[in-house]
């Protein structure tokens, strides 16, 4: 009798899970239908008539309200905001993004993504000052989100694209200082590892090779035995070899990589690099 009860429980649980799976499938199917109109606008925003935008917004709004507890609900709201942006209705796009930030204020991830799009909307209008203000808000308010990690480098790369080398270099230096501070607060976690890598990237962009090496050495000292360092060893070796013309430094890093990570996908590359160094 006990076994029979257990079997019944298992069957009921399986049915419940199947029902949940079917519900999610149904929601995803409905979302696919709701965003078809939006996708056609994204593919050709200049040719789509106003009524098509209104229809797409209406469908996505209806979906979002009906399934407000589902993760796809917020995705639908982002789709609406993005529709307004590609149609160059920037005020409406920003208004929708503001609503997203208000409704999902507890989610730093969602808020940071919405705030980035607000900044991007100003950038699309060629209002860089306003865009920059929003990007800096992300750095200050949401430093540990993906956008929080990305934005300092994004700002520097903007100046690079605009051929403003002085501002680009200043932005990379500002980013390096920010990342160092952030890494210091989280050096006992993998966040620190990731952010020290960003510090190194800043100095590499600035061609300050010694500082790049210093950043990689900090990573090696602090995270050896905690994470794989094969790519760190290889990047350091390449800087020694190609930029600093330091064969012994390059050889030392390559030998560490081969010794500590014999099964690494980078080992063959490292071995070839070592042969190249020894030829010269």
Regions found by a protein language model. Give the residues of each.
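Acidic, polar-rich low-complexity tracts and alpha-helical solenoid repeat scaffolds
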Residues: 4, 19-280
């Amino acid at each position: 009798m006990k076994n029979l009860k257990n079997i019944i429980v298992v069957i009921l649980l399986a049915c419940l899970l199947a029902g949940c799976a079917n519900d999610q499938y149904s929601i995803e199917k409905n979302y696919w239908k709701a965003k078809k109109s939006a996708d056609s606008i994204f593919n050709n925003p200049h040719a789509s008539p106003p009524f098509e935008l209104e229809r797409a917004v209406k469908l996505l709004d209806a979906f979002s309200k009906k399934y407000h507890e589902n993760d796809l609900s917020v995705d639908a709201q982002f789709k609406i905001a993005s529709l307004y942006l590609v149609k160059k209705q920037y005020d409406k796009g920003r208004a929708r993004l503001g609503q997203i930030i208000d409704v999902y204020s507890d989610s730093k991830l969602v808020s940071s993504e919405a705030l980035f799009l607000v900044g991007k909307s100003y950038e699309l209008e060629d209002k860089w000052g306003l865009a920059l203000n929003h990007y800096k808000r992300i750095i200050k308010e949401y430093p540990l989100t993906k956008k929080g990690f990305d934005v300092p480098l994004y700002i520097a790369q903007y100046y690079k694209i605009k051929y403003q080398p002085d501002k680009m270099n200043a932005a990379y230096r500002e980013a390096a200082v920010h990342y160092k501070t952030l890494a210091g607060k989280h050096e006992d976690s993998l966040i620190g590892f990731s952010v020290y890598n960003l510090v190194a990237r800043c100095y590499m962009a600035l061609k300050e090779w010694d500082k790049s090496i210093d950043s990689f050495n900090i990573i090696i000292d602090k995270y050896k035995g905690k994470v794989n360092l094969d790519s760190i060893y290889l990047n350091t070796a390449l800087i020694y070899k190609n930029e600093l013309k330091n064969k012994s430094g390059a050889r030392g890093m390559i030998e560490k990589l081969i010794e500590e990570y014999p099964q690494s996908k980078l080992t063959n590359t490292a071995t070839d690099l070592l042969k190249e160094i020894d030829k010269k």
